[in-house]
């Protein structure tokens, strides 16, 4: 869920395992909509996105970069830059539901899942939420049988997402913990992902949020994974 045509945010990731051991990650996230608009209605009808993540702390991930080209009709493209090896690694579509830098979030959680990959069913409406059941069109490509999403009626922000395994047991839950209004946009500033099977939990906190800062398309390229766009990072 994103507002504005582009944006920048600083994020602090806190990863806690089942024994209470804590690790931290700090990163800058840049995002740009690649929307085309209808000349008559001036409404976006194609909403592809590009995402750039630059890690700043701790030392073992410093200067690491993650790039996503989010597609609507084909698989997203993802790359990871490993500075210690000066290596740009393409992340296969089959790996999109694996751990993102050792956290409880998956790569796909960070970049977002394509709506066309699932069947969607409105199963309940409450005073505040639309409750939607989402079932994968290709069950063999994912580890879940379905996921249930609670979408806030006023902001359309998913406040909770529950994932169910092939046996129908809930095993992951994502929560929106805090929403602030920034530049007139309702913005998630704290979120979590909990793995009920492993006992791990990751919290993401977002600050220094800025919208419509004029990001250029060329930033979202392999070149800038090696040579980060400093003017937008600090």
Predicted regions and their residues:
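Sequence-level motif detector for i,i+2 pairs with an aromatic at +2
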Residues: 4-6, 48, 115-117, 127-129
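Residue-identity detector for glutamine
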Residues: 5, 26, 49, 160, ...
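Gram-negative outer-membrane assembly/targeting C-terminal domains
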Residues: 214-234
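N-terminal mature ectodomain segment of secretory-pathway/periplasmic proteins
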Residues: 1-84
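A generic membrane alpha-helix/interface feature
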Residues: 30-32, 178, 226-228
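Gly/Pro-enriched, hydrophobic low-complexity segments
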Residues: 67, 71, 77-81, 87-115, ...
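Residue-level signature of transmembrane alpha-helix interfaces in integral membrane proteins
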Residues: 28, 124-125
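Conserved catalytic alpha/beta cores of large enzymes that bind or transform nucleotide phosphates
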Residues: 119-121
């Amino acid at each position: 869920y994103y507002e504005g045509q582009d944006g920048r945010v600083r994020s602090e990731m806190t990863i806690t395992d089942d024994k209470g051991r804590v690790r931290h990650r700090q990163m800058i996230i840049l995002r740009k909509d690649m929307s085309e608009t209808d000349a008559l209605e001036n409404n976006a009808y194609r909403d592809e996105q590009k995402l750039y993540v630059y890690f700043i702390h701790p030392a073992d991930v410093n200067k690491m970069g993650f790039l996503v080209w989010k597609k609507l009709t084909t698989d997203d493209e993802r790359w990871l830059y490993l500075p210690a090896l000066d290596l740009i690694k393409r992340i296969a579509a089959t790996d999109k539901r694996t751990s993102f830098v050792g956290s409880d979030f998956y790569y796909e959680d960070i970049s977002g899942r394509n709506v066309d990959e699932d069947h969607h069913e409105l199963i309940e409406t409450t005073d505040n939420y639309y409750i939607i059941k989402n079932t994968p069109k290709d069950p063999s490509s994912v580890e879940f049988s379905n996921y249930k999403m609670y979408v806030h009626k006023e902001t359309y922000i998913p406040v909770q997402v529950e994932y169910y395994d092939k046996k129908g047991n809930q095993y992951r839950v994502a929560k929106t913990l805090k929403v602030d209004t920034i530049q007139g946009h309702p913005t998630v500033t704290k979120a979590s992902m909990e793995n009920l099977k492993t006992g791990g939990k990751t919290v993401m906190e977002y600050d220094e949020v800025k919208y419509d800062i004029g990001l250029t398309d060329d930033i979202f390229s392999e070149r800038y994974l090696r040579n980060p766009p400093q003017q937008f990072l600090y």
